[in-house]
Amino acid sequence: MTTTSRAEQRSNLFRFIQAVFNPLSKTILRSPLHGVMSRKLLLITFTGRKSGKELTTPISYVRQGDTLLLAVGGSWWKNLRGGATVWLRLQGKQRTAVTEVVTDEEAMSEVYQIILAQNPTQGRFMGIKASPDGKPNTNDLRQAIERGTAVVKVHLKAGVAIQ
């Protein structure tokens, strides 16, 4: 009998969620029923760095004024490096934005403190718990970084909404 590590379990869960939840989320977030999900989820559309194809994925976010904070895993976020322009379906409206990828541990810790305070589920999904002082657990954060987790700051372009 083989045992499965927590990292493998998390990876398997992530793949399951992508396969089942993502298509359903895309449909709902594009529909008039988006309100049931759009307070915490958005659709982000970007261009693949290798394929050149337009790709769309649902993702959880925390809003800080005109900046959205995304905790991201996997490798798709690498498409967002270098100030990529992205298109969002945010609370039923199309918006354009520019990305800023954060991979530095100290900067990620600051952002995760905000994420954990506003949406603890997002942190748990990435395997990062809050310490008693509200900051992310240092070991959890380091392990997440080793797994390829990053933070993406999505800066909304002022006055640019696409209907």
Describe the residue ranges of each PLM region.
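Short hydrophobic/aromatic-rich motifs at helix boundaries and adjacent loops
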Residues: 1-2, 14-17, 47-49, 83-84
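Short beta-strand segments
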Residues: 39-73
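Alpha-helical membrane-targeting segments
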Residues: 3-41, 121-134, 142-148
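Short, structured beta-strand-loop surface elements
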Residues: 7-8, 74-162
